[in-house]
Amino acid sequence: MKVKTRFAPSPTGFLHVGGARTALYSWLFAKNQGGEFVLRIEDTDLERSTQEAIDAIIEGMEWLELNWDEGPYYQTKRFDRYNGLIDEMLADGRAYKCYCSKERLEALREGQMANGEKPRYDGKCRDHAHDHPADAPHVIRFRNPTEGSVVFDDHVRGRIEFANTELDDLIIRRTDGAPTYNFCVVVDDWDMEITHVVRGEDHINNTPRQINIYKALNAPVPEFAHVSMILGDDGAKLSKRHGAVSVMQYRDDGYLPEALLNYLVRLGWSHGDQEIFSLEEMIKLFSLDAISKSASAFNTDKLLWLNNHYMRSLDPAYVAKHLAWHMADQKIDTSKGPALADVVTLLAERCNTLVEMAAQSRYLFEEYEAIDEAAAKKHLRGVAAEPLTLAKAKLAALDSWTTEALHELIEATAAELGQGMGKVGMPLRVAVTGLGQSPGIDAVMALVGKERVLARIDRALAYIEARMAAE
């Protein structure tokens, strides 16, 4: 049997991290088993579904590179298929028309709740639908079994059993003729030959109802794995108040997809004590049975740590492609300046996100607006004029503009003045970057370029002269 899984989001909002983890688990299992992964858009909620949400889901999946083998399929394009089956079920008694008004159903619900009962349809129209005019407004309900139970072995939670007496007769077609979610899902999984359904634990109560529909259609029942919810660091269900919950918000905040995928796979799945997983390792090691039943808490600090790891360990040229988006977002013109891969190499050790990296690289591409006041007060005093002037003369004559040659030049300048490296390096750092902290100034100058370095030293010398005159 070929394994086939699916990710089937409803396009009523962005792709959130819980959905992304579900998609990842489903995708990994398919790849681990040599199977196929399907993307399906469950857009039967016509009032809430939007094209904007569909675009956001697809964009998120593409950014994570969770590529699908089939799809995207859209439920709204399959209404004829669903309604054809419903008509067949209606004709042979597997479904029936229900004429109960909203007012009656609401009163029924309120009465049951007042008596401490579980709200459920009482089956009034189950055997009396013929008492109403055929063209009167109605819904179609599935005739759920009234005896026995539904049992399934969940890959995460083990054996789960529901008595059929706990289940009511589900509406499978609304008054407006639109088929409902629980019915469409079953038909889709049947038609698309889905063998394993990975989804959130909030779908557990849907599962017995869907299994009964599979059986009524004489369709094979897939296996299920219901994963636990993701909590915020305060133990509450993850929500917007915990920070970013949209996958693309993590992109915007400067995370690499590899970091987010690595983090998400560990939110409920583990392989020993291993924390770092390449995508190839995830595919090789992943199994549904190793998913934890317990809810997992989202820890932003750990995600930042992983992001820093991938910024440092991935090919700088690859990281640079993602950095380019953030440079443009921060309106930094990179057309005149160092290669972005070199910027990644320079700054990866010092940054946790690509947003930070873009911000910290600005002086490599454009002139800084002002020198940091605290850094200038400490390092651009009158005594700094001599080492800056000597260093500038040597830099102007330097033919080999490399990190190594620049390091040797700073050493030679310090030796000639009989001073420590810091007495030359720190004034140069403030002059070239406008900041009190940066990576090694030799590496920085190598990327800034000779012309800009000399001009910035002139700017710093003018600053020192003006400061001394004011004193």
UniProtKB/Swiss-Prot annotation:
<feature type="short sequence motif" description="'KMSKS' region">
    <location>
        <begin position="237"/>
        <end position="241"/>
    </location>
</feature>
<dbReference type="GO" id="GO:0000049">
    <property type="term" value="F:tRNA binding"/>
</dbReference>
<dbReference type="InterPro" id="IPR020751">
    <property type="entry name" value="aa-tRNA-synth_I_codon-bd_sub2"/>
</dbReference>
<comment type="similarity">
    <text>Belongs to the class-I aminoacyl-tRNA synthetase family. Glutamate--tRNA ligase type 1 subfamily.</text>
</comment>
<dbReference type="InterPro" id="IPR001412">
    <property type="entry name" value="aa-tRNA-synth_I_CS"/>
</dbReference>
<dbReference type="InterPro" id="IPR020058">
    <property type="entry name" value="Glu/Gln-tRNA-synth_Ib_cat-dom"/>
</dbReference>
<dbReference type="InterPro" id="IPR049940">
    <property type="entry name" value="GluQ/Sye"/>
</dbReference>
<dbReference type="InterPro" id="IPR004527">
    <property type="entry name" value="Glu-tRNA-ligase_bac/mito"/>
</dbReference>
<keyword id="KW-0862">Zinc</keyword>
<keyword id="KW-0030">Aminoacyl-tRNA synthetase</keyword>
<dbReference type="InterPro" id="IPR045462">
    <property type="entry name" value="aa-tRNA-synth_I_cd-bd"/>
</dbReference>
<dbReference type="GO" id="GO:0005524">
    <property type="term" value="F:ATP binding"/>
</dbReference>
<dbReference type="Pfam" id="PF19269">
    <property type="entry name" value="Anticodon_2"/>
</dbReference>
<keyword id="KW-0547">Nucleotide-binding</keyword>
<comment type="function">
    <text>Catalyzes the attachment of glutamate to tRNA(Glu) in a two-step reaction: glutamate is first activated by ATP to form Glu-AMP and then transferred to the acceptor end of tRNA(Glu).</text>
</comment>
<keyword id="KW-0648">Protein biosynthesis</keyword>
<protein>
    <recommendedName>
        <fullName>Glutamate--tRNA ligase</fullName>
        <ecNumber>6.1.1.17</ecNumber>
    </recommendedName>
</protein>
<dbReference type="GO" id="GO:0005829">
    <property type="term" value="C:cytosol"/>
</dbReference>
<dbReference type="InterPro" id="IPR014729">
    <property type="entry name" value="Rossmann-like_a/b/a_fold"/>
</dbReference>
<dbReference type="InterPro" id="IPR008925">
    <property type="entry name" value="aa_tRNA-synth_I_cd-bd_sf"/>
</dbReference>
<feature type="binding site">
    <location>
        <position position="100"/>
    </location>
    <ligand>
        <name>Zn(2+)</name>
    </ligand>
</feature>
<keyword id="KW-0067">ATP-binding</keyword>
<keyword id="KW-0436">Ligase</keyword>
<feature type="binding site">
    <location>
        <position position="98"/>
    </location>
    <ligand>
        <name>Zn(2+)</name>
    </ligand>
</feature>
<feature type="binding site">
    <location>
        <position position="127"/>
    </location>
    <ligand>
        <name>Zn(2+)</name>
    </ligand>
</feature>
<feature type="binding site">
    <location>
        <position position="125"/>
    </location>
    <ligand>
        <name>Zn(2+)</name>
    </ligand>
</feature>
<feature type="binding site">
    <location>
        <position position="240"/>
    </location>
    <ligand>
        <name>ATP</name>
    </ligand>
</feature>
<comment type="subunit">
    <text>Monomer.</text>
</comment>
<feature type="short sequence motif" description="'HIGH' region">
    <location>
        <begin position="9"/>
        <end position="19"/>
    </location>
</feature>
<dbReference type="InterPro" id="IPR033910">
    <property type="entry name" value="GluRS_core"/>
</dbReference>
<dbReference type="Pfam" id="PF00749">
    <property type="entry name" value="tRNA-synt_1c"/>
</dbReference>
<keyword id="KW-0963">Cytoplasm</keyword>
<dbReference type="InterPro" id="IPR000924">
    <property type="entry name" value="Glu/Gln-tRNA-synth"/>
</dbReference>
<keyword id="KW-0479">Metal-binding</keyword>
<dbReference type="GO" id="GO:0008270">
    <property type="term" value="F:zinc ion binding"/>
</dbReference>
<dbReference type="GO" id="GO:0004818">
    <property type="term" value="F:glutamate-tRNA ligase activity"/>
</dbReference>
<dbReference type="GO" id="GO:0006424">
    <property type="term" value="P:glutamyl-tRNA aminoacylation"/>
</dbReference>
